[in-house]
């Protein structure tokens, strides 16, 4: 026999309101890298541009190449004490602050100093990706119905986007405090350590909130029940290649992240060379970040009325229309800010929808293959994210090159050709990506709410 702990049914009030505080702190922590890693390498550590390029490229390529592996490992190894996924919310996060801090510490100008930064960057990402994937996997574990999964995904997205607002007020003052204590060069190392500690604490909060939601089975000698949550490499491959909705969703997710990263990266060029008022960027970021939070929070209400799939499709198409309209009125800065802010509101909705859609593909995969590949499929969400980051530089650089951009150009003398090239990256290409996302879901993602509920009932009937 096996000693099997009964799992809770229905979401607790804590999960409905506070699931996502770990994601909020996680994003706060990773934003130190997003906003200050290059600045640390060039201005504080004062490495040459060639060295900086080597460090960032090496770390990002390794990170991207490993992005698929975390879910596969979680699905394939023996479950830990507190469950296959929930256990990882407490096992590794405490190591992250110590590894992450060294990514922003300069030991010397030689190869040892460079090696320490690269190793710290790669190691910290490996360590935090396991709990990150486990955390997302818990949406499918705790969310027994499409409504529950939509609720969890929406709350998580709202908290994650709220971190952008917090970061804009916290990061610089915190860095200034540590600069006065340990010096300017390593100030971001201290910020990374502190925010890494906050992340570990908040992941522990998630660990506590999910208590009782994941089945924990202690096998004995007479146990004959096969663990359906443990998968072989063949099982994992089948869960992907025999899962057309998952492939369609990953394409749509990549397009979504392309929109986010490209628009974020090119915004400074728009306000500098088209609006000719770089100071507007700060206000634009505050407005769009707040609207992202609002969109994320409201997504669950839309999903209840339209279904998560339909909400995502309609949102992607609406965002594309808004971006195209912004391109036609690119010289009207106020209108562009309004339209781009509306698009970011839509991004908040789409960001909240996609984890719930991944959870639906997990149900489909188990129905199709007989194996529960929750960790593997949840971990695959990392792939569009990492590829999206890589496409950002390619798209922005290509558009600027076609527009004959030069850093020596006076913003006041920016040509129409340059302005249109910037708008191509800011509006047109993201709009095209969003149309692809909508079509991918419309054609390839045929999982309706009714079908998912039917598959769940059939899985339960199998025992």
Language model: regions and residue ranges:
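Membrane-embedded alpha-helical bundles of multi-pass transporters/translocases
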Residues: 2-463
């Amino acid at each position: 026999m096996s000693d099997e702990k009964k799992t809770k049914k229905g979401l607790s009030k804590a999960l409905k309101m506070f699931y996502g505080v770990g994601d909020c702190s996680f994003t706060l922590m990773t934003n130190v890298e997003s906003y200050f890693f290059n600045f640390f390498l060039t201005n504080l550590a004062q490495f040459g541009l060639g060295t900086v390029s080597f460090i960032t490229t090496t770390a990002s390529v390794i990170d991207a190449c490993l992005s698929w592996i975390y879910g596969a490992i979680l699905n394939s190894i023996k479950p830990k004490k507190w469950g296959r996924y929930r256990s990882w919310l407490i096992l590794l996060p405490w190591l992250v602050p110590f590894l992450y801090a060294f990514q922003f510490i300069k030991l010397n100008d030689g190869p040892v100093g460079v090696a320490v930064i690269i190793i710290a960057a790669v190691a910290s990402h490996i360590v935090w990706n396991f709990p990150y994937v486990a955390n997302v996997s818990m949406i499918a574990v705790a969310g027994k119905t499409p409504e529950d999964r939509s609720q969890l995904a929406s709350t998580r997205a709202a908290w994650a986007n709220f971190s952008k607002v917090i970061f804009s007020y916290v990061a610089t003052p915190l860095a200034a405090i540590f600069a006065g204590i340990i010096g300017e060069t390593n100030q971001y190392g201290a910020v990374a350590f502190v925010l890494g500690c906050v992340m570990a604490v908040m992941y522990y909060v998630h660990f506590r909130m999910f208590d009782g939601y994941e089945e924990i089975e202690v096998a004995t000698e007479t146990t004959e029940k096969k663990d359906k949550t443990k998968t072989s490499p063949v099982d994992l491959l089948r869960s992907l290649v025999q899962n057309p909705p998952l492939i369609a969703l990953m394409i749509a997710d990549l397009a979504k992240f392309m929109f986010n990263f490209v628009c974020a990266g090119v915004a400074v060029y728009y306000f500098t060379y088209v609006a000719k008022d770089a100071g507007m960027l700060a206000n634009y970021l505050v407005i769009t970040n707040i609207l992202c939070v609002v969109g994320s929070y409201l997504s669950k209400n839309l999903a209840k009325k339209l279904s998560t799939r339909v909400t995502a499709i309609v949102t992607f198409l609406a965002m594309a229309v808004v971006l195209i309209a912004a391109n036609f009125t690119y010289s009207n800065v106020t209108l562009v800010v309004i339209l781009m802010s509306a698009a970011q509101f839509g991004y908040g909705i789409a960001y909240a929808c996609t984890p719930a859609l991944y959870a639906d593909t997990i149900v489909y995969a188990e129905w199709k293959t007989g194996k529960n590949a929750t960790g593997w499929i949840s971990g695959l969400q990392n792939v569009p994210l990492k590829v999206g980051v890589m496409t950002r530089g390619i798209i922005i650089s290509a558009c600027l090159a076609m527009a004959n951009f030069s850093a020596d150009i006076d913003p006041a003398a920016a040509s129409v050709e340059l302005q249109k090239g910037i708008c191509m990256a800011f509006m047109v290409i993201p709009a095209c990506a969003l149309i692809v996302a909508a079509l991918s879901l419309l054609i390839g993602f045929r999982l309706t709410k009714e079908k998912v509920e039917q598959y769940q009932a059939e899985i339960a009937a199998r025992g």
